[in-house]
Amino acid sequence: FKFIEQNICQPLEEIKYDFDIVFHAASPASPPKYLKYAVETMDVNSIGTRNMIDVALKSKSRFIFFSTSEIYGDPLVHPQKENYFGNVNTIGPRSVYDESKRFGEALVSYFAREQNLNAGIIRIFNTYGPRLDPFDGRVISTFIRQALKNEALTLHGDGSQTRSFCYIDDLIDGIVSMSKVSEFGPINLGNINEISLNELIVQLESIFNKKLATKNLPALQDDPMQRKPDISKAQRILNWKPKVNLIDGLKLTINSFQI
């Protein structure tokens, strides 16, 4: 194999190979990153997606587009099924990610319909695990980093907002399963065990065996108040469901931060 470091928004002159599968995962995914690199985020999910589609078409390969639960925005339907069109602020700050991923889905859908692209779309919900960047700005990485440094946990809003955290190994199993079938999707990949951020802090306190102080800040604009996937489609088509519970996953993640 060969590693190629390449900006996929530029001409892909070095990529002259045939591939069995193209996994298109290129994009910032944490809010601080995609807000900081807003234009780059929109470019990679539009221009970059088109370029990778061309690679897949030339190779006649399976193409897996990594979409996101963010396409549902701040959902008014709960849990979220794949046929829910979402509640997205198209001009809000988060739209650089939400809308560019929705546009990416539109691109993939067009080429699947009109040019027989063998495509699959997966909508990835909140994921965590070892090797998570401690400074990427997502809540689990932030809370663990701050707890290890005996700092107050930064909590935006009142902590009642919910998330459904999926361990990385479970997500990878779902991605591999999607690559082995001809299903287009979209298919939700996430954990159905919903938890509030306040409850997450309690879980971390039980692991660290200490009280964790919090520093409350204003809620972030357009931050979803609830998020939970309906994964019945993934269970039916991929025979997939998460296996790792949150406590075990958090312990593995914390251990990796301490290495």
Where on the chain are the PLM-derived regions?
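N-terminal Rossmann-like NAD(P)+-binding domain of SDR-like oxidoreductases, especially those catalyzing
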Residues: 1-127, 169, 256
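C-terminal substrate-binding subdomain of Rossmann-fold SDR/epimerase-dehydratase oxidoreductases
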Residues: 2, 6-7, 126, 145-259
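Short aromatic-enriched loop/helix-cap "lid" or pocket-rim segments at secondary-structure transitions
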Residues: 15, 75-78, 133-135, 200-201, ...
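A short, amphipathic alpha-helix embedded in the catalytic core of nucleotide-handling enzymes
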Residues: 52, 111, 139, 143-146, ...
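Short clusters of hydrophobic/aromatic residues that line enzyme substrate/ligand-binding pockets
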Residues: 72, 78-80, 132, 153-155, ...
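Residue-level signature of the cytosolic catalytic core of signaling kinases
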Residues: 92, 132-136, 193, 242
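Hydrophobic alpha-helix immediately C-terminal to the catalytic Tyr-X-X-X-Lys motif of short-chain
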Residues: 103, 107, 111, 143, ...
